Amino acid sequence: MVDDRHTNLDEVFHALADTTRRAMIVRLASGEHTVGELARPFEMSLNAAVKHVKVLERAGLLRRRVQGRAHFCSLDARPLKEAAAFVRAYEGFWSDRLDALDSLLRQTSRPES
């Protein structure tokens, strides 16, 4: 059985894996933008921008509303909060593991008396 939360997290992390999409998220954090406005800083075609927008939409990070021919995009940060919670859940584990590794390295690098 597939857990829908993990499926959505997969989409979120996939969306965040691209620098262009992360930059689009940063722009959307300041407010609503058209797809053309999102594309402009990257000197990409409208078609390329639409592909990025669709990835963000699938991840639930972007909401799109259509007004006439214009597509307006806005940020939905809820999936980012879920991804952050997932990462935080493992933060203690990795911190403990790195502390143990540091301790081991200190012990093995001491000169013998």
Regions found by a protein language model. Name each.
Residues 1-8, 26, 81-113:
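Amphipathic alpha-helical dimerization/coiled-coil segments
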Residues 57-68, 72-75:
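Beta-hairpin "wing" of winged helix-turn-helix
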